[in-house]
């Protein structure tokens, strides 16, 4: 078979897999073909060994796959959340009828919501530097979902690991007390991220990752989809992150970590998030990709298209 035809067939197979991942949100594994095409980058990230963990996949292609990117970045249930996908144009024009509402869909998987609540509680315990017991977690889950506790804990643990780089560690095999292990140390003195406080440094890197994976811009819907999977909802005060809308559209925008702009030529107006100048100054696409790769137990080469883009940016910057 001619070489060009093989390439076309391979590209077609990738597109088919991407469609399947978007529909089923199964964890994508890097294929042999992708490994051959991806430049070797084993030296680009330290301590990132390949893993067969179910949380080890993030979509490979940059085409708009918001659900896949959000679900993979969040590391929780593949249930597509419709909540929080809200345009706040109504704040500027109360008469606007185009903006979708942020109502909570009754059809959402209740286990997903419980795992989100558990993630919120665990982040709070991490913030105050306290261990957590099984009994405390069962109180969050409630009697109604007690029998589903193992599944809920598994989803919450994956979310903590993939998004925030935190692992729950049982103090002893027969005990019921857990402590936290930070898999990704963002407080290294040499790191430009050392000035980021908690929880900013634990949320901003994944947010920058979602924007990068979505083609360097993410719509409100895509950002809310990601946040909803973490148990962060519009209009609800979060015990760790505070009021989420204020955090992402005001605080992080004013600090120039994010930009919040109208999508060009959108009618009715729609808004999107981009990296701000301070994000470009204090980190890079490669660092964000290395972060995502490390917490997923893989390497940046697992995302060949994004890796190539990050490499080009490094070359332009003379890194």
Swiss-Prot record:
<feature type="region of interest" description="Disordered">
    <location>
        <begin position="1"/>
        <end position="112"/>
    </location>
</feature>
<dbReference type="GO" id="GO:0005634">
    <property type="term" value="C:nucleus"/>
</dbReference>
<keyword id="KW-0825">Tumor antigen</keyword>
<feature type="compositionally biased region" description="Low complexity">
    <location>
        <begin position="94"/>
        <end position="105"/>
    </location>
</feature>
<comment type="function">
    <text>May enhance ubiquitin ligase activity of RING-type zinc finger-containing E3 ubiquitin-protein ligases. Proposed to act through recruitment and/or stabilization of the Ubl-conjugating enzyme (E2) at the E3:substrate complex.</text>
</comment>
<keyword id="KW-0597">Phosphoprotein</keyword>
<protein>
    <recommendedName>
        <fullName>Melanoma-associated antigen B2</fullName>
    </recommendedName>
</protein>
<dbReference type="InterPro" id="IPR021072">
    <property type="entry name" value="MAGE_N"/>
</dbReference>
<comment type="subunit">
    <text>Interacts with TRIM28.</text>
</comment>
<feature type="compositionally biased region" description="Low complexity">
    <location>
        <begin position="67"/>
        <end position="79"/>
    </location>
</feature>
<dbReference type="InterPro" id="IPR002190">
    <property type="entry name" value="MHD_dom"/>
</dbReference>
<dbReference type="Pfam" id="PF12440">
    <property type="entry name" value="MAGE_N"/>
</dbReference>
<feature type="compositionally biased region" description="Low complexity">
    <location>
        <begin position="39"/>
        <end position="57"/>
    </location>
</feature>
<dbReference type="InterPro" id="IPR037445">
    <property type="entry name" value="MAGE"/>
</dbReference>
<feature type="modified residue" description="Phosphoserine">
    <location>
        <position position="77"/>
    </location>
</feature>
<dbReference type="GO" id="GO:0000122">
    <property type="term" value="P:negative regulation of transcription by RNA polymerase II"/>
</dbReference>
<feature type="domain" description="MAGE">
    <location>
        <begin position="111"/>
        <end position="310"/>
    </location>
</feature>
<feature type="modified residue" description="Phosphoserine">
    <location>
        <position position="105"/>
    </location>
</feature>
<keyword id="KW-0833">Ubl conjugation pathway</keyword>
<dbReference type="InterPro" id="IPR041899">
    <property type="entry name" value="MAGE_WH2"/>
</dbReference>
<dbReference type="Pfam" id="PF01454">
    <property type="entry name" value="MAGE"/>
</dbReference>
<feature type="compositionally biased region" description="Basic residues">
    <location>
        <begin position="1"/>
        <end position="17"/>
    </location>
</feature>
<dbReference type="InterPro" id="IPR041898">
    <property type="entry name" value="MAGE_WH1"/>
</dbReference>
């Amino acid at each position: 078979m001619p070489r060009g035809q093989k390439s076309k067939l391979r590209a077609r197979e990738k597109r088919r897999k991407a469609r399947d991942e978007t529909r089923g949100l199964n964890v994508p594994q890097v294929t042999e073909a992708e490994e051959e095409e991806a430049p070797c980058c084993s030296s680009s990230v330290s301590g990132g060994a390949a893993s067969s963990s179910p949380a080890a996949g993030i979509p490979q292609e940059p085409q708009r796959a918001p659900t896949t990117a959000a679900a993979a970045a969040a590391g929780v249930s593949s249930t597509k959340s419709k909540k929080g996908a809200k345009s706040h144009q109504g704040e500027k024009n109360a008469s606007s009828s185009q903006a979708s509402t942020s109502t909570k869909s009754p059809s959402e998987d209740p286990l997903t919501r419980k795992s989100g609540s558990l993630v919120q509680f665990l982040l709070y315990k991490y913030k105050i530097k306290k261990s957590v017991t099984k009994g405390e977690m069962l109180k969050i889950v409630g009697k109604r979902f007690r029998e589903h506790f193992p599944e809920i804990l598994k989803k919450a643990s994956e979310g903590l690991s993939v998004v925030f780089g935190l692992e729950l560690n049982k103090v002893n095999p027969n005990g019921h007390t857990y402590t936290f292990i930070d898999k990704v140390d963002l407080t290294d003195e040499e790191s430009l991220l050392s000035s980021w406080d908690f929880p900013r440094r634990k949320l901003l890197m994944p947010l920058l990752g979602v924007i990068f994976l979505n083609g360097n811009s993410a719509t409100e819907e895509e950002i809310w989809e990601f946040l909803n999977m973490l148990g962060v909802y519009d209009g609800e005060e979060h015990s760790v992150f505070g009021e989420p809308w204020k955090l992402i559209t005001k605080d992080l925008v004013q600090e120039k970590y994010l930009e919040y702009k109208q999508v060009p030529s959108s009618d009715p107006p729609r808004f999107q998030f981009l990296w701000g100048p301070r994000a470009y100054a204090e980190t890079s696409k490669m660092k964000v990709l290395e972060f995502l790769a490390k917490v997923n137990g893989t390497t940046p080469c697992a995302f060949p298209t994004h890796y190539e883009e990050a490499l080009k940016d490094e070359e332009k910057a003379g890194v």
